[in-house]
Amino acid sequence: MAGKKSPRKSTINHSTHSGKLPANIKRLIKKGESDTKSRQSPPTLSTTRPRRFSLIYSSESSLSDVSDSDKNKSTNPHKIKRKAKNISNNSQGKKSKLIQRQIDNDDEGTESSDYQAVTDGEESENEEEESEEEEEDDDEDDDDDDDDGSDSDSDSETSSDDENIDFVKLTAQRKKRAMKALSAMNTNSNTLYSSRENSNKNKSVKLSPKKENEEEQKEEKEKEKEEQQKQQESNKKEVNGSGTTTTQQALSFKFKKEDDGISFGNGNEGYNEDIGEEVLDLKNKENNGNEEDKLDSKVMLGNNDELRFPNISESDESEYDIDQDAYFDVINNEDSHGEIGTDLETGEDDLPILEEEEQNIVSELQNDDELSFDGSIHEEGSDPVEDAENKFLQNEYNQENGYDEEDDEEDEIMSDFDMPFYEDPKFANLYYYGDGSEPKLSLSTSLPLMLNDEKLSKLKKKEAKKREQEERKQRRKLYKKTQKPSTRTTSNVDNDEYIFNVFFQSDDENSGHKSKKGRHKSGKSHIEHKNKGSNLIKSNDDLEPSTHSTVLNSGKYDSSDDEYDNILLDVAHMPSDDECSESETSHDADTDEELRALDSDSLDIGTELDDDYEDDDDDSSVTNVFIDIDDLDPDSFYFHYDSDGSSSLISSNSDKENSDGSKDCKHDLLETVVYVDDESTDEDDNLPPPSSRSKNIGSKAKEIVSSNVVGLRPPKLGTWETDNKPFSIIDGLSTKSLYALIQEHQQLREQHQRAQTPDVKREGSSNGNNGDELTLNELLNMSELEDDSPSHTDDMENNYNDAINSKSTNGHAADWYEVPKVPLSAFRNKGINAYEEDEYMIPANSNRKVPIGYIGNERTRKKIDKMKELQRKKTEKKRQLKKKKKLLKIRKQRQKAIKEQETMNLQLGINGHEIIGNNNSHSDINTGTDFTTNENTPMNELPSHAPEDASLIPHNSDLAVDSNTRKNSTKSVGLDEIHEILGKDENDLLSVGDINGYDAQEGHVIEDTDADILASLTAPVQFDNTLSHENSNSMWRRRQSMVEAAAENLRFTKNGLFSESALADIEGIMGNDVNHSFEFNDVLQ
């Protein structure tokens, strides 16, 4: 609200007076400046207004003379008029009592604050009137003293009266005096200070209302009057001489807020007060009131419109602290008029306008539909349509949930709307709770969201409870069908032990506490404990109405605590007390009976509750107590207790079957390893079960020899049988012997004898009786060359009955490969029974060469060989297809070249070449024939080479093999075949379609492989420079090199030494034309 002040309280009764400042402040300032010459000029307002201090202390001590307030009421009309004026405009400050900060004497300030008391409003009003009258009485006493002499006077007067001080009343009077600090508003700083000193002297004399000290006090007061008159006259002269300067000086004071007290800035900080210095006596005021009222009335009547303010010494009121309790009590109980505000305050004339504006704003807020304070529409207004809907829905809601009128009142307090927001027909377009099929409207200021998070959570909880209730009913129906009704046995557990029994079970508890089965009608306390158990699980019990507790405690439904305990344990899959105490033989039957009894009892309770309160969403009965299994026993989902220690409670047959299956699996997995040998010691429990291990440990372990050596069998770790020999585990799989030392020495001697003369009969006997096995020492110390002796190898060959060549029978395998025998390991090829299957050894003396590192038995080797054979055939077929395509390409190129050669018949008749004149396609010229022989020369007339050249090539029957084998395609060709191919004419070659045919005229059959070789050797060459002698010589050298390569039993490769492209490049480097060369590499690609 504009123009309003902060809501702080004051002690002024605003029913009759206004606490605002006057609006005509400038006029008061001018009047104050004009009237300073004719009278004592109090300080007036200047351009900057003083900050008004609003600390109020309106309580009066119960230890002071309250009866004096009636006597101090003045009938002077001037006093009443001035009092009303001061209250209405606050021109002289508030008639409140200030407690200032103590600076020099902290002990007295804390002592005075301990005895402060707060009274009711009537005492505060009486004290306000007293303070106003005291102010008038003090005005006459404020004319006597200066600031310089005030300290010594007060010290001398009060210190002499210490023996007459009543400290209880002194503290109360000090509080009254502290609150009266701002009442002296009519004089300047000197007059105010001197009047306060004089009043202090009067008060210090009257320390107690006893009549014994009255005579002494009267004598002191007469002296004070004389001093006050002298001070008044001197002060008037000083004020008349410097009126304006005094006003500016008085207005220059500053408030200092320190800790709990507020002090002024122009005080004498080095001043120390004595005890009882500022005790106020209202009786003395009445006695001396006549003379003081005259001077006071002269000042006040002439300067009624001026604003007066205090300039209080800081040291004068420095020992008083604010009573915080009284201060905040006054603030909370009074109105906020006349308090400290900003510099721009409103006067009396502005109040009606501000009140009218406030009413208009409030009415707009009440009538505005679009504004809401807590998210609801019409917070204070009423909508007839809404009221009707609320009534209808409220009645319907009460009928469904069974609420009474008290619950309705609670619901009205808790929420503004009793029906969900999405069911309101006014907001049917807003699908806040829709399933997403309808488009949702965005929220706006005209349609605020009416449901907060609390309401949403309530709705979700209600829906969840409904679903859980339905599921529970279905479970009960299924359980009734599966289980047979039988009697139940429950333990009689005390109510105090309920919480203990939920978490702890004792073995002896169930044996002595068996009780009868049945339903107890006096089960009120049991259900109460069930509610306690539900409070442990459910966190929303405080939101439930009070009706449910009456429903639960009605005694209509009852059960026992042990039953509820077992229900909890049943859901959590934990063993109950009943099962822990029973034996294993009778455990299953008793558990089944108890389960059926528990579930039947819970079924009866649940059906009754469901029939009576079917639609009750907030029902907290046993049927609505749902337990999170993971909260009670997190490990129950993974672990089920075995029958030996404690058995798990299973509520259905399917759970039992699952648990039995899991137990069987667990026994299978944790089956103990049993060795055949009964004398075995130090069994390692960490070993895998025997099913995962092979029969002979280490039978598949292989040692890889260097691949540089071909034909050596890979070594193998030795194996042992543990039937008759004791052994112990070293590192899981390796063993050590446990024979005696004497037996070991005997075995060592036998070992040395075997090294010199190996005994083969030992191996033959070991197969029969499995005795006399190798020990660890024997394996470590045996000779590596034992297998290399001729007799031993001969015996091994006779045992295997394999066909082996003469070199291997003589035992010269190492000599053949010329590789020294290096011992690799003490376990290599030792401890192997030679009479076992072939898969335990790789046949080193068989015809088949096994590559280094080849692992597997004969069966796997055969499979791998078949796979390799199929792969080789596939690659061979692909290679043949590529060659056939290249041959066709070559023939096409040759036919093209023949057509070009027909135009050059005259130039090509050199060196015995006869030109065939016919134009048919068979008159081709073989440009690759030998220059020394005619192309028509028969093969038997070809020059024969040295026999030693042909003897290097073995004449096998593999030369004319089918094209499916790779050997024939890569086999070297002898000189005779080359001369035969080179001496033949083109007409002698068979066509591709007649490979297996026979030419009767020539008497030769050309195979497919020979045709491939022929095509590669007789590759076409460009004939641009055929007549040149150098070209012919290079062609001859090329052909002669091919013949030499074939004579030396070297293979032709597509990127080898004798490729056409390499030789052509060499010829180009030597000076010949590069175009003359034929790219032989491209042909074989």
UniProtKB/Swiss-Prot annotation:
Stretches of Polar residues bias are at 9-18, 39-48, 184-197, 241-251, 484-493, 546-557
Q: Where in the cell is it found?
A: Nucleus
Q: What is this protein called?
A: Protein IFH1
The yes or no answer to whether the keyword Lipoprotein is present is no
Q: Where is the composition biased (Acidic residues)?
A: 120-165, 607-620, 676-686
Which residue windows does the record flag with biased composition (Basic residues)? Answer: 76-85, 474-483, 513-524
Q: What is the lineage of its organism?
A: Eukaryota, Fungi, Dikarya, Ascomycota, Saccharomycotina
Query: Which UniProt keywords are given for this protein, alphabetically ordered?
Result: Nucleus, Phosphoprotein, Transcription, Transcription regulation
